[in-house]
């Protein structure tokens, strides 16, 4: 996610200097630098780009179980697309978890977010449902953040309202090149999460209702369930947030990804309310992540 956001920052840097930039090219180069930063050797024919500030961060370039589909795509040295992809059946979570950053884009057209998230997902994952789940996550992040930062009425909207809107989107995807198939599995997972929002997502309940696979739409559904359950129980002081995050990473599935998605959505919803700041400071690499965010905000014309 941090490398995705840094790529979008680079696009803004070029634009602010009066030079148009190719978003997808910046994203691909960022992922190749991340691949290189983890100690892998890119293909000889892969394009090279100079290091950026993010590449000096040890926590953000630590090799912590990167997915095989992601590594295979980046190892090829060829830019993958929706139409031609080295991983046509890839349904795991590598593309999903890095897509939240597209929800931070301050653009009015929803279609811009959807297409960019889908095409960025296709850089490593080719299955249509992987593209759809990535776009759904980006849209959900965007909607939750808009509610938290908008009018007082908007702030009263629950995460459940945002989930319902994304479910509607999943059921109305137009037939176009970005999505060679519908988002039926992603929609089903979100519908199930919404129906279960009053049920505690214990590891046993998660296994019963979602199973233990590591598929992108399953992981998104579990994370949204955790988010819905936790968000309704966080006090004004932030009490309950840590318990919700601990619950998220206890699932017998891709718990890292479930925790990351849950944390992103809860963070977008509640911000740094109450006593959450000490919790944030405990995170490894927190300063590095904040620096990435500050550079993005600075390019938007705001002071960090």
Locate each region found by the language model.
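Structured, active/binding-site neighborhoods that engage oxygen-rich ligands
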Residues: 1-304
């Amino acid at each position: 996610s941090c490398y995705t956001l840094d790529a979008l920052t680079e696009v803004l840097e070029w634009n602010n200097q009066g030079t148009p930039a190719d978003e997808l090219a910046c994203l691909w180069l960022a992922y190749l630098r991340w691949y290189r930063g983890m100690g892998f050797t890119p293909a000889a024919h892969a394009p090279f780009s100079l290091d950026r500030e993010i590449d000096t961060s040890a926590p953000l370039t630590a090799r912590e179980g990167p997915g095989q589909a992601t590594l295979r795509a980046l190892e090829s040295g060829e830019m993958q697309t929706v139409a031609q992809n080295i991983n046509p059946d890839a349904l795991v979570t590598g593309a999903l978890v890095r897509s939240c950053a597209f929800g931070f884009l301050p653009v009015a057209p929803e279609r811009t977010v959807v297409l960019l998230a889908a095409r960025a997902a296709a850089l490593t994952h080719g299955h249509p449902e992987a593209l759809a789940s990535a776009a759904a996550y980006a849209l959900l992040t965007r909607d939750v953040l808009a509610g938290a930062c908008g009018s007082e009425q908007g702030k009263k909207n629950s995460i459940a309202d945002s989930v319902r809107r994304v479910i509607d989107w999943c059921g109305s995807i137009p037939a176009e090149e970005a999505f060679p198939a519908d988002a039926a599995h992603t929609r089903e997972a979100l519908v199930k999460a919404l129906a279960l929002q009053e049920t505690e997502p214990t590891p046993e309940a998660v296994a019963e209702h979602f199973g233990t696979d590591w598929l992108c739409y399953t992981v998104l559904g579990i994370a949204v369930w955790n988010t819905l359950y936790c968000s309704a129980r966080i006090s004004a002081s932030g009490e309950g947030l840590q318990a919700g995050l601990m619950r998220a990473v206890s699932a017998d599935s891709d718990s890292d990804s479930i925790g990351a998605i849950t944390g992103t959505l809860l963070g977008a919803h509640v911000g740094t309310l109450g006593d959450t700041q000490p919790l944030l400071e405990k995170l490894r690499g927190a300063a590095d992540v904040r620096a990435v965010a500050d550079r993005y905000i600075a390019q938007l014309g705001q002071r960090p």
